């Protein structure tokens, strides 16, 4: 998403909107966006970007500094039309990055708005997006794969099964953070994890536990000086952090869930979902 001109699928989507051949490859809530996909790429409000000339029409494209966006067919400016009028005719809405935490309408990789999710849960999209990977194995270029965060997928089990079939059961490891005592699910078609749990064990070998007392004392002094509350029990820290994420950088996703549930899009519903 960060460089639409380098991604033919995304470029076609921005050009043709819902009518794009590749529209089904991306998970976009078109209705919430008023029929447009919202792109949080601006450093200011769009009116200010237009007023300063940072946003401009350049041939058959909209330009914002180094960012390029296609104009929809038939949407080029006529005489005396300003850039905001042209922008209003596009299948995308350029908006300030400050809105990304609560106003996005496309699925992304966790809180990284520059990485739009591809709907690999759809067999046709999987086949189209993994053809090159299949060729690597057919040509003997690679022997295995690392899959980043499969839990971020809509259907991780089915995805790994398709990947296993595509690669003829090649060596595949997944980036999955396991809790202490947790094991990789047996139903994952994978040979193991990327090793974070092993790294945690190695860390314990290399770190002197006698330093804990000194670090705890330093933490207490800093909390007293800064006015921070006393240390909370670890489960409370985890629960509070998860809630902060749901109410912060992933609020767009929480709002999407409330809409998918058919529930009111208000603070009370968001709180219940989080």
Where are these regions (language model features)?
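Acidic/aromatic-lined carbohydrate-recognition and catalytic surfaces
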Residues: 1-107, 139, 149-222
């Amino acid at each position: 998403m960060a460089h639409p001109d380098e991604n033919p699928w995304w470029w076609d989507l921005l050009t043709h909107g819902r009518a794009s051949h590749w529209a089904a490859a991306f998970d976009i809530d078109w209705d919430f966006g008023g029929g447009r996909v919202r792109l949080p790429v601006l450093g200011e409000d769009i009116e200010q970007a237009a007023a300063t000339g940072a946003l401009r029409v350049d041939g058959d494209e909209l330009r914002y500094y180094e960012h390029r966006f296609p104009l929809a067919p038939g949407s080029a400016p006529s005489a005396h039309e300003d850039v905001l009028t042209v922008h209003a005719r596009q299948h995308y809405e350029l908006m300030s990055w400050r809105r990304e935490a609560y106003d996005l309408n496309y699925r992304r990789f966790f809180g990284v708005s520059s990485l739009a999710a591809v709907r690999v849960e759809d067999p046709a999209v999987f086949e189209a997006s993994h053809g090159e990977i299949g060729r690597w194995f057919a040509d003997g270029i690679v022997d295995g794969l690392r899959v980043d965060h499969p839990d971020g997928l809509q259907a991780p089990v089915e995805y790994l099964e398709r990947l296993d079939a595509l690669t003829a059961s090649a060596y595949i490891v997944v980036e999955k953070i396991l809790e202490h005592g947790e094991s990789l699910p047996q139903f994952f078609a994978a040979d193991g994890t990327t090793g974070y749990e092993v790294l945690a064990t190695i860390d314990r070998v290399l770190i002197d536990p006698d330093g804990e007392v000194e670090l705890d004392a330093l933490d207490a002094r800093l909390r007293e000086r800064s006015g921070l509350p006393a240390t909370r029990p670890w489960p409370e820290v985890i629960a509070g952090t998860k809630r902060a994420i749901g109410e912060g950088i992933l609020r767009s996703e929480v709002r999407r869930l409330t809409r998918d549930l058919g529930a009111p899009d208000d603070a009370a519903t968001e709180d219940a979902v989080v």
